């Protein structure tokens, strides 16, 4: 936003730096018709900012589906978790990643990566009066068309953290996240519970049905378990 103010000031030969710290409740594109003075300047810069954020999200999704950097022949299996940032800037990023996902890539194809996870939380996006409820509804519309985002319930007993505070700008530290399509990242035997700076070294898939088929003919329980 500040960069757009500077660029507009250079074009108009006007110093708009006094608007650098103007409080914005949301970044939404609007028609400039009928707007004058500072209101028009602010909205024009907001419009440009939203366009740049959208283009950045398009580039991000495109790169995650085209850059082969995993063993040299596979795109990165990437995941992003979002939904609890209620700041104007955070909501803008969330809205534009959802817009990009809804539109699709290329000729309208569904992007496989990054895997997207919406974190749903009471007081944030659970009820109509919550600040991000509008984005949650849009996320539902996007997932109905594109399969993403998936949804993670932060209010589930095993996902709750007593240190989570809606007024804490770093509350994401106390939020569960998921990686890929199977890994829940939060619990920690050797330190505080958090998803920040965490990951997995490898993944394991157990074919329980196959194990049952292989053991179904073994009558002795101990031998069956050992097998």
Language-model segment annotations:
Residues 1-227:
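Conserved catalytic cores of very large enzyme subunits
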């Amino acid at each position: 936003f500040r960069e757009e103010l500077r660029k507009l000031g250079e074009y108009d030969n006007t110093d708009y730096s006094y608007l650098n710290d103007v409080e914005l409740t949301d970044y939404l594109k609007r028609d400039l018709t009928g707007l004058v003075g500072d209101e028009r300047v602010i909205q024009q810069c907001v419009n440009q900012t939203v366009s740049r954020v959208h283009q950045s999200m398009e580039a991000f999704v495109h790169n995650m589906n085209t850059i082969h950097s995993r063993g040299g022949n596979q795109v990165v299996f990437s995941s992003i978790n979002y939904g609890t940032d209620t700041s104007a800037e955070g909501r803008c990023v969330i809205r534009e990643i959802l817009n990009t996902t809804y539109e699709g890539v290329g000729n309208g194809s569904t992007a496989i990566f990054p895997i997207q996870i919406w974190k749903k939380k009471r007081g944030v996006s659970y009820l109509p009066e919550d600040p991000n409820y509008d984005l949650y509804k849009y996320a539902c519309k996007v997932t109905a068309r594109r399969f993403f985002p998936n949804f993670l319930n932060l209010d589930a007993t095993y996902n709750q953290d007593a240190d989570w505070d809606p007024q804490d700008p770093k509350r994401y530290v106390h939020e569960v996240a998921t990686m890929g399509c199977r890994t829940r990242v939060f619990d920690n035997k050797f330190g505080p519970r958090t998803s920040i700076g965490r990951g997995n070294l490898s993944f394991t898939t157990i074919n329980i049905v196959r194990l049952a088929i292989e053991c179904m003919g073994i009558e002795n329980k101990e031998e069956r378990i050992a097998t």
